[in-house]
Regions:
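Extracytoplasmic small-molecule ligand-binding "clamshell" domains
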Residues: 27-101, 240, 250
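Alpha-to-beta junction loops
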Residues: 38-39, 73-75, 91-100, 143-144, ...
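Beta->alpha turn/N-cap motifs
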Residues: 42-46, 79-84, 93-105, 121, ...
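Periplasmic-binding protein-like
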Residues: 44, 120-127, 203-245, 261-274
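Extended ligand-binding regions for polar small-molecule ligands
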Residues: 62-71, 131-139, 143-152, 203, ...
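Ligand-binding cleft/hinge of the Venus flytrap
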Residues: 65-74, 153-176, 206-210
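Acidic, polar ligand-binding/catalytic clefts
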Residues: 66, 70, 75-138, 213, ...
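A ligand-binding cleft/hinge motif common to bilobed small-molecule-binding domains
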Residues: 85, 102-110, 156-163, 185-188, ...
Length: 274
């Protein structure tokens, strides 16, 4: 894990690759069909969207992948990898699709194109169940926070910082993690004051461990999660959007949301690109 005390978050886009690089190396839908294989990358520890349990891939995205395989005329090769490098791998063409619930951010759309959203991904904070100092967003001022390196929780700090400033507060120590389960462990052990993550993930966490964690309020603007391809790969994006529209219309997506996320997000927009 990486420890940093952060003062400003205006230039997060620097970690992403250029649009030109994305367009230069990404395989088109025609090329994928010609070679007979599409390579997708999914995360290894992103419950309830993607995770591995007893050696078996689990989660909402894995069930959506099973539906996509039934529709596809080509083989789909799934690579289960850590979060770090996943989106960059798609931007450079190493993988064709980030088949992960990637939160759509202004920085990411510089090098990636996103499908129809698959879930709400508004960022919230979570604290220990017995935490008495933090009752609202304003109380986060000066407190240590855990976020995922390069993830949407890190990007949410750009919204939280000015919110705290309105009441004279500032961000405290920011600790970045490769995966958020590490952050939850540090939170439980008192090494952090709060952790930021998407609403779905935190609902799952607090439902599974109500005696350890308590969910707080939203720390950023409404956001959504979707699959991603390299920016400019319009044919592949259209193919995936057609699939997404079909599973929405059939109700299969909403049934999977109920199963894995605890609720159906039927009011999601057709597009949520910022």
């Amino acid at each position: 894990m990486l420890f940093v005390r952060t003062k400003t978050f205006g230039i997060i886009a620097a970690v992403m690759l250029t649009v030109g690089a994305s367009q230069a190396f990404a395989a088109s839908l025609e090329e994928i069909k010609a070679r007979g294989t599409m390579t997708v990358a999914t995360e290894d520890s992103y419950k309830p969207f993607e995770y591995v349990e007893n050696g078996k891939p689990m989660g909402l995205d894995h069930e959506l992948l099973a539906l996509l395989r039934k529709e596809a005329s080509f083989k789909i090769d799934q690579q289960i990898i850590p979060w770090t490098g996943l989106l960059a791998g798609v931007a450079t063409g190493k993988y064709d699709v980030a088949l992960t619930a990637a939160v759509i951010t202004p920085e990411r759309v510089q090098s990636l194109a996103f499908t129809m959203p698959i879930a709400d991904a508004t960022q919230y904070y979570v604290v220990r169940a017995d935490e008495s100092r933090i009752k609202g967003v304003a109380d986060l001022a000066g407190k240590s926070v855990g976020v995922q390196s390069g993830g949407a929780s890190y990007a949410a700090l750009a919204d939280l910082e000015p919110t705290l400033a309105k009441t004279g507060g500032k961000l405290g120590k920011v600790v970045q993690y490769t995966s958020l389960p590490e952050a939850y462990q540090d939170l439980a052990n008192g090494r952090l004051d709060y952790v930021i993550n998407g609403v779905v993930n935190l609902v799952s966490l607090t439902k599974d461990q109500p005696k350890r964690f308590r969910m707080g309020e939203a720390v950023g603007a409404p956001t959504y999660a979707a699959w991603a391809v390299a920016k400019g790969n319009d044919g592949l994006l259209a193919y995936l959007d057609t699939f997404m529209a079909k599973v929405r219309a059939s109700g299969e997506l909403y049934a999977l949301q109920e199963k894995w996320l605890g609720r159906a997000f039927k009011d999601m927009p057709a597009t949520a690109t910022k």
